[in-house]
Amino acid sequence: MFDITLSDDLTVNIDGTSEGTQTKFYDKGYWYKTDTFEEGIVEYLVSKLLTFSTLPKKSYVVYEYGKINGKSGCRSKDFLKPGYELITFERIHQRITGTKLSVKKFEFESTESYIEYTVDFFRKYLDLDIKKYLKNVFTLDFITLNEDRHFNNLAAICDTKNNKYLTAPIFDNGKSLLNGNRSYRPAFSIEENIKKVIALPFSGSHKKMFDYFGKGFSIEIDSALEWLNTEPQSLYRDVLIYQLSVNKNLE
């Protein structure tokens, strides 16, 4: 766990990259985010979970939990090389068409057609296949119950010198594990509370998106549970334990 003091001149304002209320800093190759709710511990738990998965380490951002100017939060290493730019799906679509990808939803009669439009769009305009990326993202979100996977939390990386694109590592998982869920009731069981979770961006159902793309990766469940049992008790730890336990045979 880190503990750092950062001056205000290191604050960075980034438009259109997430729900957007966390204070962000950049210093010596690290991004820092202070908590609005309890995003830091959730980011840590979710990214640590992925170290027990079959995903390559370059395909997700690893977050550390700690203190920033006395407040809880998290940090992660800058994954962009010089000459590379992170551009969200929302911004890419708006640059090319003048319309937000999120509002295109109302033009389609089904989740499937909305997904197909999005996949085809990135293939056509960026020569980028995003299917594997989305398969991995929605496998993770199905397990961790991410409720903030809007199109500013999905992104591509542009090699500005060669004008080529690749998918970004998975980032921004802080609104997972019932964190920030406005329907959460402490008196209800985890099983009851997760019934109220609403997914993004193609459907309100995590299962529907998972079923469309299929399983993106596997997790060493027993090893992950062994690790979680060493973590301090919290709602988020308990939700993750529950989700791993009920999805042991995820296919």
State where each predicted segment sits:
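Conserved ATP-binding subdomain of kinase catalytic cores across diverse folds
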Residues: M1-L101
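Regulatory N- and C-terminal appendages and interdomain linkers associated
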Residues: M1-N13, Q22, V42, K124, ...
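Hydrophobic transmembrane signal anchors and adjacent membrane-proximal interface regions, especially
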Residues: I4, V12, L101-F106, A199-L200, ...
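Short C-terminal domain-edge/linker segments immediately following a structured domain
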Residues: V61-Y65, F106-E109, I198-G204
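ATP-dependent phospho-/nucleotidyl transfer catalytic cores
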Residues: F79-F138, V246
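Conserved kinase catalytic-core segment
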Residues: E112-L177
